[in-house]
Amino acid sequence: MDEEIAALVVDNGSGMCKAGFAGDDAPRAVFPSIVGRPRHQGVMVGMGQKDSYVGDEAQSKRGILTLKYPIEHGIVTNWDDMEKIWHHTFYNELRVAPEEHPVLLTEAPLNPKANREKMTQIMFETFNTPAMYVAIQAVLSLYASGRTTGIVMDSGDGVTHTVPIYEGYALPHAILRLDLAGRDLTDYLMKILTERGYSFTTTAEREIVRDIKEKLCYVALDFEQEMGTAASSSSLEKSYELPDGQVITIGNERFRCPEALFQPSFLGMESCGIHETTFNSIMKCDVDIRKDLYANTVLSGGTTMYPGIADRMQKEITSLAPSTMKIKIIAPPERKYSVWIGGSILASLSTFQQMWISKQEYDESGPSIVHRKCF
């Protein structure tokens, strides 16, 4: 596709926004889904201080800002801020005029209907896009892995879903949602580091802890055994340098943090872990397709990037499933962006072109058109 008329693909995650052009193999812009507002009144006259900052700029000025995430648990909760993020995406990151390109947006499975209507309305009325479409994130991840049947365990910053998909259609009755994801793990790491005597409290310091989590955490194959190793030797300890030069050491926190994915009771939650949720999702499906789901379990999203997570999933699901069942966990290396990549593939298919909701259709039917055209 020509870049002149290429569709724009925007994957709005709770933690990061991924945006770019359909047909590309990776998003051009990846920035935090945050809007920051100054905590203090400006004293320097003529400094040209803005009333809000978006993305990386908010991140770099985080010391003087209050940071807010407009998407919580995968669902947009603050539309004014969301509009700022989209504006920033089009005009500052991609540097395109949205009125010249069709836009493919993504949404969480089981998203409230009003949510996708509002997205549709903003695209057509605020940004005047010629056409748009809303696709379900997990389905796009499956496309990106080159499959049309499988179960996707998609875990990002705000929410985790297990979505069984058969021949390209998500099976809504079997989708399970777990409000436990990256942000909760960051908060948990903040808590267990506090027990070590390090204090992280502000929204800005939370970002430092997120970095520690991404660089040093991993999933243990056998949690109890790993705890034993950590207690008896210092082989698992790693050090991390804080922005002020102070060095902190972390040991069993490295695997205690993501262990909460398998044991949500660590966070005081009563829900099942990701392995059991995946299994329960499969069990809600027709008995004839379960075999295909077990053999095509695809991991997607940033929270599945921990080293060791695929082996642990394999071990846990094997112990839950029938003993003769072949179980395969697929963890594509680019899974952090697989939702975006799937969107890029979908929006550049010739067969998809008649699926777009056009401005004309929107003007005739209103926002509810999105339920008829996007499934």
Curated annotation (Swiss-Prot):
It is found in: Cytoplasm, Cytoskeleton; Nucleus. SMART domains: ACTIN. The keyword NAD does not apply. The modification N-acetylaspartate is found at D2. PROSITE patterns: ACTINS_1, ACTINS_2, ACTINS_ACT_LIKE. It catalyses: ATP + H2O = ADP + phosphate + H(+). The modification Tele-methylhistidine is found at H73. GO terms for cellular component: actin cytoskeleton; actin filament; cytoskeleton; dense body; focal adhesion; nucleus; plasma membrane. The modification Methionine (R)-sulfoxide is found at M44, M47. Its EC number is 3.6.4.-. Skeletal muscle, heart, gill, digestive tissue and brain. Widespread expression throughout the brain, with highest levels in regions where neuronal proliferation is greatest. Keywords: Acetylation, ATP-binding, Cytoplasm, Cytoskeleton, Hydrolase, Methylation, Nucleotide-binding, Nucleus, Oxidation. Oxidation of Met-44 and Met-47 by MICALs (mical1, mical2 or mical3) to form methionine sulfoxide promotes actin filament depolymerization. Mical1 and mical2 produce the (R)-S-oxide form. The (R)-S-oxide form is reverted by msrb1 and msrb2, which promote actin repolymerization. InterPro entries: Actin (IPR004000), Actin/actin-like_CS (IPR020902), Actin_CS (IPR004001), ATPase_NBD (IPR043129). It is an enzyme of class 3 (hydrolase). The modification N-acetylmethionine is found at M1. Belongs to the actin family. Actin is a highly conserved protein that polymerizes to produce filaments that form cross-linked networks in the cytoplasm of cells. Actin exists in both monomeric (G-actin) and polymeric (F-actin) forms, both forms playing key functions, such as cell motility and contraction. In addition to their role in the cytoplasmic cytoskeleton, G- and F-actin also localize in the nucleus, and regulate gene transcription and motility and repair of damaged DNA. Polymerization of globular actin (G-actin) leads to a structural filament (F-actin) in the form of a two-stranded helix. Each actin can bind to 4 others. In vertebrates 3 main groups of actin isoforms, alpha, beta and gamma have been identified. The alpha actins are found in muscle tissues and are a major constituent of the contractile apparatus. The beta and gamma actins coexist in most cell types as components of the cytoskeleton and as mediators of internal cell motility. This is Actin, cytoplasmic 1.
